[in-house]
A protein has these predicted regions:
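Mid-to-C-terminal "cap/lid" subdomains and adjacent gly/pro-rich loops that border
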Residues: 36, 48, 60-68, 255-261, ...
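A conserved FAD-binding loop/helix module that cradles the flavin
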Residues: 492-511
Length: 536
């Protein structure tokens, strides 16, 4: 007889993991994740032996598929993403985390909230009127308390960030300090390596925070469990079928099935389950953030690129009229630390003295990373879980990125280059002084061969099933008792890393599930928690 739970959550990342921590005390919850659960009690600043081993013995095989017939590495799914209209047969590898904690377990830890223009854009795109800064404020505050979100004392800032801020401000460019969700960070310099788990448990992922909370409350977590189908009977989600340890198992859900497999995985699971036949919006409206690094060489060898936390500050590239563009610059977060793919070129592992020695060879490097937050392009996710196709054609028919994206990126590269020149940089790549056709081609090649980060919107929330997949709370228009809770439901593209918004929308979903699905009406909402703190 199949096991039965009140709620089944498919995916233990930023969305599903956060949701689980908030609802597990109020009903029986099964959490399924396709990746491993790296065990050990959280020890911020030290790390559990299991997570230390995982973080220090990762190699390129973690990112690449195990074989030609698989889209899985050890900790990641890898999907083909087609980005270049001028070369329709070429694809890049889009990697999505496959580990308990999901993207929150391997991201850089930068915590940015959406801007006002984003909230306005949600309503413009799908008509939602309650996706507002005010409505989400308590949920951001709840998440920020749980994840220890803060800004670093300037004594811990990377040297390049200190000088970058000073010079940018002198040029009239508004600079913002970047918050992050870390605790007891030892500033090892590895947080730049997006895709690397934190060796020292300092990155406050859901694997460190909400998943342990859910397990303590009685939830069941099954790792290495790949969901293959949502069980739907008479238009009602009644459970899921998953594969684990060579067995195929069906688990029943009395009240709710939650898809939280990310903006790529969730629409694929809905497609595998036939939901796209009921709602053609499934997998459509893909938004993402293509980006480029800029690296510079500076005089001296005391820039300490192998230490510190590089995501200290950010700003928008500014026009001559002082207007912000949609290109966001993170400084000094170029590639001044050796990333996994660079380390692979040196044929070393991502651990031990050989790895650190490579990082320390480049003592005069600094840089920034530039994201284009609102490209004038919309993509889609099609195919199946085992044979997915992602189309995000930001590359135009003549080998150059679409106009808005390339114009914003060229402006940003030139502006960042000028700042670094004033810091003393004697070379940069890409170089804003290069002829514009050369610069545009360089950046276009980089973007269309490296992918686009932060996918969003593939099961977007709205007020009309003709233009959306779920309602404002994430509940499916077409299948009763089915919820989506991850970046896929974001109604329109945002001007920030999505991690903060995903956790805030998951907090909001948790209040809804506790109250409306589980009937726990005496449980404090996020707003209740904030009001209680105010009166203490």
């Amino acid at each position: 007889m199949a096991d039965t739970y009140d709620v089944i959550i498919c995916g233990a990342g930023s969305g599903g993991g956060f949701l689980a921590g908030e609802i597990a005390a109020n009903g029986s919850v099964l959490i399924l994740d396709a990746g491993p659960h790296i065990m050990g009690d959280p020890k911020p600043g030290v790390g559990s032996p299991e997570r230390r081993k995982t973080a220090t013995q990762v190699n390129l095989g973690t990112w690449l598929p195990a074989n030609r017939d698989s889209n899985r590495g050890d900790l990641f799914f890898t999907y083909p993403m087609y980005m270049d209209q001028s070369n329709p047969f070429a694809s890049t590898a889009q990697r999505e985390a496959k580990v308990v904690g999901g993207g929150s377990f391997v991201n850089v830890g930068a915590w940015l909230r959406p801007r006002r223009v984003d909230w306005d854009g949600f309503q413009e795109a799908t008509g939602v009127t309650d996706w507002t800064k005010r409505a989400f404020e308590a949920h951001f505050l709840r998440a920020e308390r749980i994840l220890n979100v803060h800004r670093d004392s300037r004594e811990y800032w990377n040297k390049a960030s200190v000088l970058y801020e000073r010079i940018a401000l002198s040029m009239g460019i508004p600079i913002f300090e970047t918050a992050s969700n870390r605790q007891a960070c030892i500033f090892c310099g590895h947080r730049l390596n997006a895709g690397m788990p934190c060796k020292y448990d300092a990155l406050m992922s859901t694997a460190i925070t909400q998943i342990p909370k859910a397990l303590k409350a009685g939830a069941t977590l099954l790792d290495n469990a790949s969901v293959v189908n949502i069980e739907i009977t008479n238009g009602i989600a009644t459970g899921v079928t998953y594969e684990r340890n060579g067995q195929t198992v069906t688990a029943n859900a009395r009240k709710l099935v939650v898809m939280a497999a990310g903006a790529i995985g969730t629409p694929l699971l809905l497609r595998d389950s036939g939901v796209h036949l009921k709602n053609p919006n499934v997998g459509q409206h893909l938004k993402a953030h293509p980006g480029v690094p800029i690296d510079v060489l500076l005089p001296g060898d005391d820039w300490g690129s192998d230490r510190g936390y590089q995501w200290n500050i950010h700003h928008h590239a500014m026009t001559e009229n002082g207007e912000p563009t949609d290109a966001v610059v993170h400084a000094s977060a170029g590639f001044p630390a050796t990333t996994p793919w660079v380390a692979a070129a040196f044929k070393i592992g991502l651990f031990g003295r050989p790895y650190k020695d490579v990082m320390r060879q480049f003592k005069s490097r600094a840089g920034a990373f530039i994201f284009e937050m609102k490209p004038n392009v919309t993509g889609r996710v099609t195919g199946t879980r085992k044979n997915a196709v992602i189309s995000y054609l930001v590359g135009g028919p003549y080998g150059v990125l679409e106009d808005k994206t390339i114009d914003d990126l060229v402006l940003a590269v030139r502006q960042v280059g000028e700042i670094y020149k004033k810091m003393g940089a004697y070379t940069a790549f890409p170089n804003g002084d290069d002829p514009e056709p050369v610069l545009k081609q360089q950046m276009s090649l980089f973007v269309t061969t490296s992918g686009a980060l932060h996918p969003q919107g593939t099961c977007r929330a709205g007020v009309d099933p003709k233009t959306s997949v779920v309602d404002t709370w994430g509940m499916s228009w077409d299948v009763k008792n089915l919820m989506c809770c991850d970046a896929s439901i974001i109604p329109n593209h945002i001007s920030s890393n999505p991690n903060a918004l995903i956790m805030a929308l998951s907090s909001r979903a948790a209040d809804y599930v506790n109250r409306e699905i589980l009937g726990a009406r005496n449980v404090r909402t996020a707003a209740d928690e904030i009001e209680s703190e105010v009166h203490q």
